[in-house]
Amino acid sequence: MTDLFDYKEFLKTVTSQPGVYRMYDTAGTVIYVGKAKDLKKRLTSYFRAQVANRKTETLVKNIAQIDVTVTHTETEALLLEHNYIKLYQPRYNVLLRDDKSYPLIFLSADEHPRLAVHRGAKHEKGEYFGPFPNSYAVRETLALLQKLFPVRQCENSVYRNRSRPCLQYQIGRCSGPCVEGLVSEEEYQRQVDYVRLFLSGKDQQVLTQLITRMEEASQQLHFEDAARIRDQIQAVRRVTEQQFVSGDSEDLDVIGVAFDAGLACVHVLFIRLGKVLGSRSYFPKVPAGTELSEVVQTFVGQFYLQGSQGRTLPGEILLDFTLTEKDLLASSLSELAGRKIQIQSRPRGDRARYLKLARTNASTALITRLSQQSTIHQRMKELAKVLKLDEINRMECFDISHTMGEQTVASCVVFDANGPVRSEYRRYNISGITPGDDYAAMAQVLKRRYGKALDDQKIPDVIFIDGGKGQLSQAFDVFASLNVPWDKQKPLLVGVAKGSDRKAGLETLFLASEGEGFSLPPDSPALHLIQHIRDDSHNHAITGHRQRRSKVKNTSALEMIEGVGPKRRQVLLKYMGGLQPLFNASVEEIAKVPGISQALAEKIHNALKH
């Protein structure tokens, strides 16, 4: 039992209402979040002579304080619990580590709605459909919709500045609402309605409405309209016949689970509109001694309740595990979605086959991850031995990228005991330095990264600096000047200098800013890990630099041309429909823009091409 916390006095003050509790350690860090229908009964269970499992026993020993939040209902408690878990990331809770938002299809609420890919919070007014397992699935669906229903997909900035229809109109994939007279308001909204129905899985309603319109057009002797609608009907039918994998057009998530060697894999199979769109494997962080039932229960709650703002909830969730709080979770999700959501664990027919597929994928992904972890763990041990450290739990690596000193970007990548932690990768735009001064750039990024308070878990054991003794010397100077509350002596600073011909395996490592460095054998597992984190850092930096350079190039290209002022720039962009069409235009096409002579058109064309 804990000596840190007077639980008897605390329990006297606890109500029997539903609510959420947060447990803290001596450092004031939240170490566990839970919810209960009866707070008093639930919290009392932690302090019995015999606790449920080893994890609970360890947790109780570390409790120094408990805070309680009373809620009106158990459903409210469930939602609050998952919000707190996401906020505090307590170490004794099962944590869903991959919290990247899913791509969705967005149908805007503009006068002439547009279709687009969307990620993240739903700030813009409109309708959201999904989720899709990856951006490829979204792009494929948008391309399909473009062939079936001519609804615009261009950005508003392009749409508002068009004076003539673009190529998409010419090939029949947009009805051209940007130009007055090409499509009636009624017809455009009708196509938007078809998109809405199609994305909601109501293909038959789309076909029924199209058939009715075709017959009406034929009766009124509007044979061209009837033929066009007939072609649209045939296209929709071809798509639905090709892509349905079952007769069910419901939205469905199928969840398979595998568990081995303390690691869990939850594989989610996404079925939208009766089609398998794809899948994704998740590896939640599982505290030692956690039962598999708790892993599944917590994962499902976090996955849908924490991510509900970024994803469309399916009509049904299939599991290969019976949840103890299935009814509570189903009612909470139904309340959130405003419609009934079912959770099933004993499906038949096609659903049973889907579940078997999800389970198989979970097992395969788990075997692969265990194999990768074994390699990473071995490399971590070897690197710790080389650097004379007891263990390495966190490493960070920095690199600088620029072109002739312009658009300088620094990157920081993070590895933990299990390898890359991509959600913590960061880029820093560097400014206020002499162009090309890599030392100053490195000093700036290190000050920005470490010149502030850090959680103990975020302090790296090793910091790799991509560069030789000069870069490492800058790092030592920065750390010497830091005035921070955390132990700045903890990180070991290591310089990684490339070989003379920059070949992998010829790297030199420096642990001090003076003296000779040392090299590791080409087959050293420790060297392979250093190369891995160094290459990730380099790729992250150069990608960020290219994006920044491209953005600057595109926005400043016209401004650099003599004779093209703000008014002419505006006329050019409006007439051509944006910067990209202008880049692709010929001299003759540019010369057609009002106010642009043949000579100026040639100058603009040459400047943009070169």
Swiss-Prot record:
GO biological process: DNA damage response; nucleotide-excision repair; SOS response
CDD domains found in the cross-reference section: GIY-YIG_UvrC_Cho
GO cellular component: cytoplasm; excinuclease repair complex
Domain GIY-YIG: 16-94
Keywords linked to the UniProt accession: Cytoplasm, DNA damage, DNA excision, DNA repair, Excision nuclease, SOS response
Main location: cytoplasm
Alphabetical list of InterPro entries matching this protein: GIY-YIG_endonuc, GIY-YIG_endonuc_sf, GIY-YIG_UvrC_Cho, Hlx-hairpin-Hlx_DNA-bd_motif, RuvA_2-like, UVR_dom, UVR_dom_sf, UvrABC_protein_C
Annotated TM spans: none
Lineage top rank: taxon: Bacteria
Subcellular location: Cytoplasm
Gene Ontology MF, one: DNA binding
Record-annotated UVR domain positions: 204-239
Gene3D superfamilies: 5' to 3' exonuclease, C-terminal subdomain, GIY-YIG endonuclease, UVR domain, UvrC, RNAse H endonuclease domain
SMART domains: GIYc (SM00465), HhH1 (SM00278)
HAMAP family in the cross-refs: UvrC
Family: Belongs to the UvrC family.
NCBIfam families given in the database record: PRK00558.1-5, uvrC
Function: The UvrABC repair system catalyzes the recognition and processing of DNA lesions. UvrC both incises the 5' and 3' sides of the lesion. The N-terminal half is responsible for the 3' incision and the C-terminal half is responsible for the 5' incision.
Subunit organization: Interacts with UvrB in an incision complex.
Name this polypeptide is given: UvrABC system protein C
Source organism of this protein record: Yersinia pestis
